[in-house]
Amino acid sequence: MNSPAAYSVSKNSLFHLTKWQASYFAPHVNVNMISPGGILRNQNKRFRKKYINSTPLQRMCYEEDVVFAILFLLSDLSNYITGQNLIIDGGYTIL
């Protein structure tokens, strides 16, 4: 997706769909979404350096970070969480 507007609209649509599903399926099903930041893959060194310098935790997201979030949401530890967007971006979006 090359358009920031299209990305923003699609992400916002998913968030509102999540909230609707959470209210519709409650109290029997909890519905949440995950929004990971930049996941470390094969990005070039320049991109990685720029991204890392823009993130308070000073690193990119590892695949395991997303897996741990999913496991948390699947566990009883999150049984009172529904309709939420769990942002896993090392603080990138707070700056």
Regions found by a protein language model. Give the residues of each.
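A glycine/serine/threonine-rich, flexible loop-to-helix segment
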Residues: N2, A6, M33-T55
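A conserved structural motif in NAD(P)-dependent oxidoreductases
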Residues: T55-V66, L77
